[in-house]
């Protein structure tokens, strides 16, 4: 006998086959499971023996509720998950772009039992320790790009050719090459420290400086402007790219 958790979609957020609902759409007929059905279903599932509900929203036709990309708002499933908690005695967990500060508030208030964090752990393996030790400014944030963890990278119209039978394809990160590939991209301390000049302070230049520093070298970036970031300063200008900044 062991505890059994169910990943439970509270509401389907689906308008028709292949047509998911967006966050701003509230006046539509639910094609899948609505809240009234969900309130009954969670009780049936509890009676069937499930011990915990790890909750989000959505279906394959509205996948972006369960795995929110950068276009979705933070805590997008919170309202629905907190509502369904009222209808079960099992622990209820909320997933989906959970802000850690908001998550802590809701758990402390008893409106949630826990939150589920996945992608943030791929980009920064020490993020929870940094929060606990008051080092939030050191956290490398997930930008919700899905290019590494979901194998969705595109280049000039060509899909990522990474084989889907690769067991690691959902455990990689576009921002952290060492995630599940630490043997391939292991950062090895140098035995011959050098002072290294890096021309350009864009994303590539900054990452180069970071790795060189971690290896024990002394990197120096030469940037022609008074800002680091290069073209990514423009690329991250949209309001929904707050973590890119």
Describe the residue ranges of each PLM region.
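Flavin-dependent oxidoreductase catalytic cores
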Residues: 1-199, 203-214, 218-219
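Glycine-rich FAD pyrophosphate-binding loop
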Residues: 217-233
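N-terminal glycine-rich dinucleotide-binding loop that anchors FAD/FMN and/or NAD(P) in oxidoreductases
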Residues: 234-245
């Amino acid at each position: 006998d062991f505890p059994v958790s169910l990943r439970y979609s509270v509401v389907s957020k689906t308008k028709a086959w292949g047509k998911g609902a967006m966050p701003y759409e509230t006046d539509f007929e639910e094609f899948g499971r609505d809240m009234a059905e969900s309130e009954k279903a969670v009780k049936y599932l509890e009676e069937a023996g499930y011990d915990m509900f790890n909750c989000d929203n959505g279906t394959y036709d509205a996948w972006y509720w369960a795995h929110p990309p950068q276009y979705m708002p933070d805590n997008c499933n919170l309202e629905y998950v907190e509502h369904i908690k009222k209808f079960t005695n099992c622990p209820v967990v909320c997933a989906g772009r959970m802000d850690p500060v908001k998550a802590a508030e809701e758990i402390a208030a008893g409106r949630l039992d826990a939150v589920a964090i996945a992608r943030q752990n791929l980009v920064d393996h020490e993020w929870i320790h940094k929060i606990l030790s008051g080092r939030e400014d050191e956290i490398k944030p997930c930008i919700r790009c899905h290019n590494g963890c979901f194998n969705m990278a595109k280049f000039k119209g060509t899909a990522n050719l990474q084989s889907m039978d690769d067991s690691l394809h959902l455990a990689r990160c576009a921002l952290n090459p060492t995630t599940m590939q630490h043997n391939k991209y292991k950062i090895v301390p140098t035995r011959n420290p050098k002072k290294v000049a890096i021309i350009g302070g864009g994303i590539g230049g900054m990452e180069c400086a970071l790795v060189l520093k971690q290896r024990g070298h002394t990197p120096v970036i030469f940037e022609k402007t008074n800002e680091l970031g290069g073209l990514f300063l423009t690329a991250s200008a949209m309001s929904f790219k707050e973590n890119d900044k």
